[in-house]
From Swiss-Prot:
Family, as annotated: Belongs to the bacterial ribosomal protein bL27 family.
Gene expressing this chain: rpmA
Record keywords: Ribonucleoprotein, Ribosomal protein
GO biological process, one term: translation
Residues annotated as signal peptide: none
Name of the protein in its database record: Large ribosomal subunit protein bL27
Matches recorded under NCBIfam families: L27
GO MF annotations, alphabetized: structural constituent of ribosome
UniProt-annotated stretches for the region Disordered: 1-26
Organism of origin: Oleidesulfovibrio alaskensis (strain ATCC BAA-1058 / DSM 17464 / G20) (Desulfovibrio alaskensis)
A GO term from the CC aspect: cytosolic large ribosomal subunit
HAMAP family xrefs: Ribosomal_bL27 (MF_00539)
Pfam families: Ribosomal_L27
SUPFAM superfamilies per record: Ribosomal L27 protein-like
């Protein structure tokens, strides 16, 4: 004989881990080659000088330097581009 009533079953109770997207290095910050600048879905921020684009749209520094962001217009849309200004040797 059962001593407990049957517990209900639920199809909820799961959650995925956060993706941790966003800007990792802001304008004016110093970076080393290979540092991640922005993690994003699609190109919210476009790569500029000395910035590479990974297969998951991650932007990374190609050389040591200082990060700068700029707004620019393309086909009547205002877009953001990130550059790395090389450090003076």
């Amino acid at each position: 004989m059962a001593h407990k009533k049957a517990g209900g079953s639920s199809k909820n109770g799961r959650d995925s881990n956060a993706q941790r997207r966003g800007v990792k290095r802001f304008g004016g910050q110093s970076v080393l080659a290979g540092n991640i600048l922005v993690r994003q879905l699609g190109t919210k921020v476009h790569p500029g000088n000395n910035v590479g684009l990974g297969k998951d749209y991650t932007l990374f520094a190609k050389c040591d330097g200082v990060v700068t962001y700029e707004k620019f217009t393309r086909k009547r849309r205002v877009l953001t581009r990130v550059h790395v200004l090389p450090a003076e040797q």
